[in-house]
Amino acid sequence: MSATSTSRVSREERREAILNAARRHFVSTGYHGTGMDDVANTLGLSKPIVYQYFSSKHDLYLAVLEKAGKNLQDTISTALNQSGSNRTIVRASVRAFFDFVDDDMQYYQLLFDSDMLDDIEAAEHVEQVMSTVVTYIAHHISHATTLDPARAQLLASSVVGASTSAAKTWVKTARHELDLSLIHISEPTRLLSI
């Protein structure tokens, strides 16, 4: 068979397919309602094949969570790496967070609204993701303003905390009623024009 044959899938492509199928199941039926056989059946695979990639459902869940976190971190990092004023860039990072929520609702749900948030490893992973996002923003703030690193970290934590809280409310109550472009969630960034 040739390398381009549709019947042969690379190990990485299969791993991605398993992660995507698992993400859909974990979001729709929760961690406890999802079995490895559900993921395997979705892809037309045997359960032992899924276990070749992930040793347990918990390992699979953490891998999906890791992918969600990387997606969020990349989204924020991209927003922070554009040109413009400090205020514009931090506003763009807030907007990027809301775009992540809107575009990647399943990843958002896994990170912030999952039945596994009480799992120690999952909670630590989400905390690490958010800590990294805060660090990205704080680094940008401290290099673009006269704020010392500790104050930049505090301000970045405030921006991320406010964005996370507002996003939860937006998702639960007003997501389809409010035009996101009209939400001035990033007004606290006015403080950054110091």
Enumerate the language-model features and the residues they cover:
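Amphipathic alpha-helical segments used for helix-helix packing
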Residues: 100-121, 138, 165-172
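N-terminal intrinsically disordered/low-complexity leader segments
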Residues: 1-13, 150
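Alpha-helical DNA-contacting segments of helix-turn-helix folds
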Residues: 59-68, 75, 129
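Hydrophobic alpha-helical connector segments
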Residues: 63, 77-103, 155-159
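Helix-turn-helix
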Residues: 17, 21, 25-59, 63
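Amphipathic alpha-helical packing segments from all-alpha helical-bundle domains
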Residues: 70-73, 120-145, 153-158
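Single conserved hydrophobic/aromatic residue that forms the stacking wall/gate
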Residues: 183-194
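Short, hydrophobic secondary-structure boundary micro-motifs
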Residues: 109-112, 149, 179
